[in-house]
Amino acid sequence: MSVATEGSSPSQVLADLHVHSEWSWDAPRGAMAESCRRAIALGIKAIAFTEHADYSALAAGARLDVAGYLETVADCKREFPRLAVWSGVELGEPHRFPAEASGLLTRGRFDLVLGSLHSVISGDSVLELSEVDQLAQADPQQTMRAYFAELVELIEGPVAFEVLSHLEYPKRFWLPGWAPYRSEEYEAEIRAVLEAAVGRDVALELNTSRGGDPTRALCPSPVVVGWWRQTGGRRLSVGSDAHDPTTVAAGFRLAGEIGAAAGFAPSAVRIGLWTSA
């Protein structure tokens, strides 16, 4: 996956490394071929289809058809030779489901493996962070601290992955009645996550959440990208988390500006990866 990027501007994001297609259980409007066409039209040079591999109750037993998915990736590689099309998977809570996650990784070759936390352990139950009815019963500060603590467990868990996805994910679903979310309120917890990622040589993702309101959508917040560099983080991955072709690379202009402001620049070795000096 080595593609030279010399000549690109410092704020230009050339790859979308977090996209879902029809092979993700929560992407009914996903379409891999159409997402490739959209990427080419936008000047994107590489796209990674990081399909969900979730084992929580929210996935309702949905399982990634690895063989079918990889066949579609191969078809798109042939159809779009101008675009680097990468296979990938987004492992949900792999530290809780190590046998399932590890087993999936043996069933095919994945160019990119993301690690994600979409829920947290809350007492004797699991709190799904995207479910408003469950969030309404939760304490926001306790939820965030539980989330950051479990992220450390995920990073240090038995299943290895390359990129930590959408840090600060719960703020996407922040309820109107809660006090505004501020990263600074959780700086110690966030820095512990970043230190764990540095220790395991995991890259941090800047996720634009399909180009939504930056206050809620940018995961993590710009200040956290700066902390990542301060902590010793050297690699930054950028992804839209698109679940349909229309939002491929959405929000990338702002993402590029944030990466550059924090001291990251597009890698001259691996397209899509941003590195610090």
Model-identified regions with their sequence ranges:
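An N-terminally biased module of ancient metal coordination in phosphate/nucleic-acid-related enzymes
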Residues: 1-95, 111, 172-184, 208, ...
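Conserved, mostly hydrophobic/aromatic
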Residues: 18, 39, 113, 166, ...
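Non-catalytic positions within long, well-ordered alpha-helices that form the structural scaffold/packing
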Residues: 40, 106, 155-157, 229, ...
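Hydrophobic residues within beta-strands of alpha/beta enzymes
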Residues: 47-49, 113, 164, 204, ...
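Extended substrate/RNA-proximal surfaces in nucleic-acid metabolism proteins
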Residues: 59-199
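Active-site-adjacent C-terminal substructures of enzyme catalytic domains
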Residues: 184-249, 258-259, 264-266
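Extended, intrinsically disordered, low-complexity segments
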Residues: 263-277
